[in-house]
Regions:
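Conserved small/polar residues in nucleotide/adenosyl-binding loops
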Residues: 1-5, 144-150
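Rossmann-fold NAD(P) dinucleotide-binding segment
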Residues: 4-20
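Active-site-proximal cofactor/substrate-binding loop regions of enzyme domains
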Residues: 18, 41-51, 55-65, 69
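Rossmann-fold NAD(P)-binding glycine/threonine-rich loop
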Residues: 23-44
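Conserved active-site and cofactor/substrate-binding residues in soluble primary-metabolism enzymes
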Residues: 28, 51, 55, 67, ...
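Conserved anion/nucleotide-ligand pocket segment
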Residues: 62-116
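Substrate-binding/catalytic subdomain of NAD(P)-dependent oxidoreductase enzymes
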Residues: 96-146
């Protein structure tokens, strides 16, 4: 765990409220971080780490708690969603769709985490941990990357 992540744990240990969008921390150390928040009765909010402006964490924790969720599927990365939409609706090729996403500011300067599936995999690990009430880390999450796909 890096120093930045330790600050979050220290804040929770001190009973402080924490708001984070750090999906790397939550995907790899979520059980420890959420456990510390529970132990110290500290409020840990991380809705921004998953699906941006789409509220999914609170519904998974509260509204869906009594349901039997069997799978979580979807396109949970905005850059990927944009690229796939351009490829399917406009017939744009992958390279041009990625360039346009970058030009519009949807893609990072280094879009590797987006197009290789790491970002989506981390988000799925976080959501799965909550939905299935079990520790799910990034490594076993099934995801498909976009690097050099053919035209849709």
């Amino acid at each position: 765990m890096c120093i930045r992540d330790r600050y979050i744990l220290e804040a929770l240990e001190a009973g402080k409220q924490v708001v984070t969008a750090n999906k790397d921390l939550l995907a790899e150390h979520g059980e420890e971080v959420m456990g510390m928040a529970d132990k110290m009765h500290a409020d840990l909010q991380f809705e921004a780490a998953v699906a941006g402006a789409i509220p999914i964490i609170r519904p998974l924790k509260q509204s869906m708690a009594g349901n039997n969720i069997t799978e979580i599927i979807g396109i949970v990365n905005g850059t990927t969603n944009y690229i796939l939409t351009k490829m399917t609706e406009s017939g744009m090729n992958y390279k041009d769709a990625l360039a346009k996403a970058t030009e519009l500011g949807y893609a990072e300067a280094d879009p590797t985490a987006d197009v290789e599936g790491y970002d989506a995999g981390r988000k799925m690990a976080i959501m799965s941990s909550i939905a299935f009430n079990s520790r799910v880390t990034f490594n076993p999450v099934s995801y498909t990357h976009l690097t050099l796909p053919t035209k849709a």
